[in-house]
């Protein structure tokens, strides 16, 4: 599906932070170039919730949050925080663990107001709920629209995701492709792009250019300690992907 990156034609890896290279989905970055990155976490509204009340995934199950939580409509992500709350891997394929994570999600249902796709941004901005589980990219959109919203990566850890640049096998115009890839990796261009999109950049050259108000915001540029506790998703394979999806559908049908 993808062609390997030609290191003689692409000169931009030197600009990228090593913490965001050589991930399990592409050892050695043979096929991919990191474009943006982010996390899964909790958005809360400080008019109704204190930060200290949402610093752990386990706190979501508190009875005081009945009918107050919005979930992202994603089997992998919702199972991830349930598994993490039990001290398990986000890539768990042990039947007992996955079933236990499902049971724990079922127990959360009284606290779930809705399970949403992209509209979770609008719901949180309009204060339809005080808590939302979502990705950092969408969280940045929410925060830009409502000063009372904040984003937390729970202390137990979470998922770290990447948007990557890659070359499909069907590609033909390689001169233009590598010109584009090198252009996008130039620190000044990567910095401008990050400011426009409002996602976290893995480009260390861009980090030096971006204002400290951006790169110093630990909601979206967390500490090394936090980064070490973030995990990429592995491909579960067709069988286990279907198991997760089936169990998630059962969860969504759970009576409140």
Write out the residue ranges for each language-model feature.
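Extracytoplasmic ligand-binding site segments that recognize negatively charged/polar headgroups
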Residues: 1-111, 116-128
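Conserved C-terminal helix/tail region of periplasmic/extracytoplasmic solute-binding proteins
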Residues: 225-256
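Periplasmic-binding protein-like
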Residues: 98-107, 113, 145-169
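A bilobed periplasmic-binding-protein/Venus flytrap-type ligand-binding module shared by bacterial periplasmic
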Residues: 41-48, 84-85, 161-176, 184, ...
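Short, hydrophobic alpha-helical packing/hinge segments within bilobed ligand-binding/sensory domains
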Residues: 57, 120-123, 139, 177, ...
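Mature extracytoplasmic/periplasmic domains
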Residues: 168-228
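A ligand-binding cleft/hinge motif common to bilobed small-molecule-binding domains
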Residues: 125-126, 131-148
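Short beta-strand->loop
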Residues: 2-15, 32-33, 147-159, 168-171
């Amino acid at each position: 599906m993808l062609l390997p990156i030609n290191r003689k034609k692409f000169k931009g890896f030197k600009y990228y932070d090593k913490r965001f290279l050589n991930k399990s989905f592409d050892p050695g970055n043979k096929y991919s170039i990191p474009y943006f990155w982010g996390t899964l976490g909790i958005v809360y509204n400080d008019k109704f919730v204190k930060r200290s009340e949402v610093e752990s995934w386990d706190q979501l199950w508190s009875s005081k949050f009945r009918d107050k939580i919005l979930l992202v409509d994603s089997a992998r992500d919702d199972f991830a925080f349930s598994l993490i709350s039990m001290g398990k891997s986000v890539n768990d394929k042990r039947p007992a663990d996955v079933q236990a994570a499902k049971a724990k999600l079922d127990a959360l249902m009284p606290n779930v107001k809705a399970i949403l796709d992209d509209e979770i941004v609008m719901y949180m901005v309009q204060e339809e709920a005080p808590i939302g589980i979502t990705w950092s990219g969408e969280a940045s959109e929410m925060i830009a629209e409502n000063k009372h919203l904040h984003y937390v990566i729970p202390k137990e850890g979470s998922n770290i995701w990447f948007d990557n640049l890659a070359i499909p096998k069907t590609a033909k115009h390689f001169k233009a492709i590598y010109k584009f890839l090198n252009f996008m990796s130039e620190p000044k261009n990567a910095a401008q792009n990050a400011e426009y999109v409002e996602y976290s950049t893995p480009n260390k050259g861009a980090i030096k250019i971006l204002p400290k108000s951006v790169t110093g915001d630990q909601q979206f540029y967390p500490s090394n300690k936090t980064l070490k506790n973030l995990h990429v998703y592995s491909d579960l394979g067709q069988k286990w992907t279907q198991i997760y999806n089936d169990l998630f559908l059962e969860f969504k049908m759970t009576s409140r």
